């Protein structure tokens, strides 16, 4: 029997390079990864490396736009260490989108105080449903419950997988572990699509439940954008000054962290987000430079920290609604936003996810494949349960399909009904 451990890679923490980069570049010499990451983020390191010839970079550019220079047109790849110029006529059509979206390997040289790209290669492999199906089969053979796979994949010990890390058949039976597993399952739903449609989420949970860990892993795993400030029109949709595309056009999902801190600063941008979340149409404010007329149906995940107060008799969805209203957002905006959100999450008892870190994650190629597999299965299993109306009904049907595709739960229809009141973990 194939061990599930063969599909997992260790999390490397060195204090400089994000662990997710090592996961994405597994098999590459660690010193080389660190050197390439430093070149992408430290302007002095890049300048020094180029003084000896060419320099290698690995990372995702923060923005990409076009610029004329000496009668030639270039893509400008913006990194913390500097702007890299890539001649448009040297870019193969097959990688144009990847330059905007993916983790890149870039080789550069310096001429006249400018950096020019001499080689570029997208590093993220395309997902394959077959790999996801294989992962599911191996998990089943190893006695790992399918609803534990998301938590295991993102680096946490679960009840059914604990024997992998303890070396014994003794399982960890802990309420916090079970709640963390459910929380990761709900989060994982947002990485999949049902019939091409995304699932949006809003989470307010106590600190140390793994919100940011989930978001940062998704930057490289599934090309999500991460925002830890009130999103602006320029960052979200398009910069009118440079015409650089914003996150919704360059990423396959957006995670907005620390939402509880932004107050009324969210008011204006939510108008844009409503149409984007429901119809995939993202436009800037009236009178601004037009954004591309490209339909982008991508998940939006709002997350923030909840205080220690209990919900009492209040439902999770109503609790989140009250928090949004207290942020001085208009009632009509709050209602419209929550109408588009399938998954609302809150907790009362602490979880402390850091207590259950395994030190390993499922390799990107297999976890990415599993997301594709789940999307395919959920699309096939989608059916109308006849519960609720409008978007609520659509969301209940989507969660039911995802539940059937990812768990062995007996009553996914009952589980999906929680869309109406929200999920308390």
Swiss-Prot record:
Pfam families documented for this protein: BrxL_ATPase
InterPro entries in UniProt: BrxL-like (IPR014061)
Protein name: Uncharacterized protein ORF425
């Amino acid at each position: 029997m194939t061990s599930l451990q063969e599909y997992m890679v260790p999390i490397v923490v060195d204090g400089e390079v994000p662990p997710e980069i090592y996961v994405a570049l597994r098999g590459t010499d660690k010193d080389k990864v660190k050197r390439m990451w430093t070149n992408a983020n430290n302007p002095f390191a890049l300048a020094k490396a180029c003084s000896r010839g060419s320099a290698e970079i690995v990372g995702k550019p923060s923005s990409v736009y076009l610029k004329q220079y000496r009668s030639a047109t270039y893509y400008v790849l913006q990194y913390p260490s500097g702007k890299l110029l890539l001649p448009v006529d040297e870019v193969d059509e097959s990688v144009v989108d990847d330059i905007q979206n993916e983790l890149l390997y870039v080789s550069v040289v310096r001429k006249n105080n400018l950096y020019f790209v001499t080689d570029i290669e997208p590093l993220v492999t395309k997902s394959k449903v077959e790999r996801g199906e294989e992962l599911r089969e191996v998990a089943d053979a190893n006695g790992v419950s399918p609803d534990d796979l998301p938590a295991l994949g993102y680096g946490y010990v679960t009840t059914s997988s604990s024997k992998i890390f303890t070396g014994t058949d003794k399982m960890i039976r802990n309420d916090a572990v079970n709640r963390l597993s459910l929380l990761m399952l709900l989060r994982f739903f947002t990485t999949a699509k049902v019939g091409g449609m995304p699932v949006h989420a809003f989470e307010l949970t106590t600190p140390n439940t793994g919100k940011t860990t989930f978001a940062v892993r998704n930057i490289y795993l599934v090309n999500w954008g991460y925002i830890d400030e009130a999103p602006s029109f320029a960052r979200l949709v398009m910069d009118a000054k440079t015409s650089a595309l914003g996150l919704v056009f360059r990423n396959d999902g957006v995670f907005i962290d620390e939402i509880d801190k932004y107050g009324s600063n969210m008011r204006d941008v939510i108008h844009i987000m409503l149409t984007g979340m429901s119809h995939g149409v993202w436009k800037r404010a009236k009178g601004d430079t037009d954004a591309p007329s490209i339909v982008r149906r991508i998940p939006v995940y709002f997350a923030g920290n909840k205080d220690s107060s209990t919900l009492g008799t209040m439902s999770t969805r109503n609790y989140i609604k009250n928090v949004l209203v207290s942020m001085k957002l208009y009632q009509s905006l709050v209602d419209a936003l929550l109408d588009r959100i399938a998954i609302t999450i809150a907790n009362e008892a602490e979880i402390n996810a850091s207590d259950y870190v395994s030190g390993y994650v499922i390799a990107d190629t297999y976890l990415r494949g599993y997301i594709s597999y789940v999307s395919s299965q959920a699309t096939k299993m989608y059916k109308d349960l006849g519960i609720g109306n409008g978007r609520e009904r659509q969301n209940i049907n989507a969660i039911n399909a995802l539940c059937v595709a990812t768990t062995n739960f007996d009553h996914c229809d009952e589980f999906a009904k929680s869309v109406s009141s929200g999920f308390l973990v």
